[in-house]
């Protein structure tokens, strides 16, 4: 049996993201984000679903194991480190990510947490900037939404 969740991004950068996970295993994120500047944009799960102060109140990257920032394929990374999405010349990014660390169940579930799309490219912790090992030097927060259980 699969578990499904959804996240709706609103504002000038908007979209719908669908999450699907089989009972045990990787979680797949699919969807589309529009209104972006063409190029790569950091794409992360943040620790809180609190959007009372816009994306700022969503906290830092979801990092229950207290690791440094990294790429999705790295063994050492934040759970919420999903790398980058790439917007085409029309400003639309098609999302199709399968990740082994995010989960829709259990103690470290991402349900109720926020997805954040960033202004710049995530350097995956390898850029040598002061904030590379914490945020991937991905810049400001363009859009966010809370991940919720899908009734379908």
Swiss-Prot record:
Cysteine disulfide partners in this protein: 55-144
Binding site for Cu cation: 44, 46, 61, 118
EC assignment: 1.15.1.1
Binding site for Zn(2+): 61, 69, 78, 81
Entry's Gene Ontology cellular component terms: cytoplasm
Keyword DNA repair found: no
Subcellular location, record wording: Cytoplasm
Reactions the enzyme catalyzes: 2 superoxide + 2 H(+) = H2O2 + O2
Activity regulation statement: Inhibited by KCN and diethyldithiocarbamate.
Keyword tags: Acetylation, Antioxidant, Copper, Cytoplasm, Disulfide bond, Metal-binding, Oxidoreductase, Zinc
Major localization listed first in the record, in broad terms: cytoplasm
Span of the signal peptide: none
Subunit-level organization: Monomer.
Function: Destroys radicals which are normally produced within the cells and which are toxic to biological systems. The plasma superoxide dismutase has phagocytosis-stimulating activity and may play an important role in the biological defenses of the organism.
Family: Belongs to the Cu-Zn superoxide dismutase family.
Official protein name in the record: Superoxide dismutase [Cu-Zn]
């Amino acid at each position: 049996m699969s578990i499904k969740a959804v996240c709706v991004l609103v504002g000038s950068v908007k979209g719908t993201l669908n999450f699907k996970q089989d009972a045990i295993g990787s979680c797949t994120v699919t969807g589309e984000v529009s209104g972006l500047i063409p190029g790569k944009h950091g794409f992360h799960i943040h620790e809180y679903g609190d959007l009372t102060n816009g994306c700022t109140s969503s906290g830092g990257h979801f990092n229950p194991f207290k690791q440094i920032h990294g790429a999705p394929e790295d063994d050492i990374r934040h759970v919420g480190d999903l790398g980058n999405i790439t917007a085409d010349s029309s400003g639309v990014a098609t999302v199709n990510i399968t990740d082994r660390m995010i989960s829709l169940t259990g103690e470290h579930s991402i349900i109720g947490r926020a997805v954040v799309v960033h202004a710049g490219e995530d350097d995956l912790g390898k850029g040598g900037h002061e904030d590379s090992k914490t945020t991937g030097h991905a810049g400001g927060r363009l859009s966010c939404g809370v991940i919720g259980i899908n009734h379908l």
